[in-house]
Amino acid sequence: MTPALRKAIGFLRLRGVNDLPDGTVEIDGTNVFAIVQRYDTVKTDVPKFEYHQQYIDVQFIASGEEVIGWAPRERMLLTEAYDAGKDIAFGTVEKGKWTAAYLQAGQLAVLFPEDGHAPKNAAGAESSVMKIVVKVAR
């Protein structure tokens, strides 16, 4: 594990991390930082996939549950071209060509730049989620 990924995981193990307000938390400047967010998951037959080139995502579910779709990024049909300023592109993946990862409170997924991923999907019924996404520069 790289030192930056170690910092990301170490941050998620801190006491009180579940009490953080929404927003950005600096961990190691622009090399490692966290985005705290709360939202309701959605039911959909066509998940909205995304990918990043500059950062690895460590997506930690602090409370609630969700399904994150995963597929190799080359399977994505882009609906919004890559925006380098925001480090994100959006697209879809043909049904049957992606995998669903079920995450519940206390679990995480590490998503690399080659990974297309579709967060915020309901795991059955729609539910409220608190997620901390730690961004780790490649």
Task: Say what each PLM segment does.
Residues 102-121:
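Conserved metal-binding segment of the jelly-roll/cupin
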Residues 34-52, 62-77, 113:
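Conserved short histidine dyad/triad with adjacent acidic residue
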Residues 108-110, 126-138:
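A short hydrophobic beta-strand segment most commonly corresponding to one strand
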Residues 1-36, 43-51:
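A short, N-terminal "cap"/entry segment at the start of jelly-roll beta-barrel domains
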Residues 1-8, 14, 80, 86-92, ...:
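Compositionally biased, non-globular sequence tracts
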Residues 36-52, 84-97, 118:
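Short acidic (Asp/Glu) patches
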Residues 56-60, 101, 108:
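His/acidic/aromatic-lined binding-pocket segments of jelly-roll/cupin-type domains
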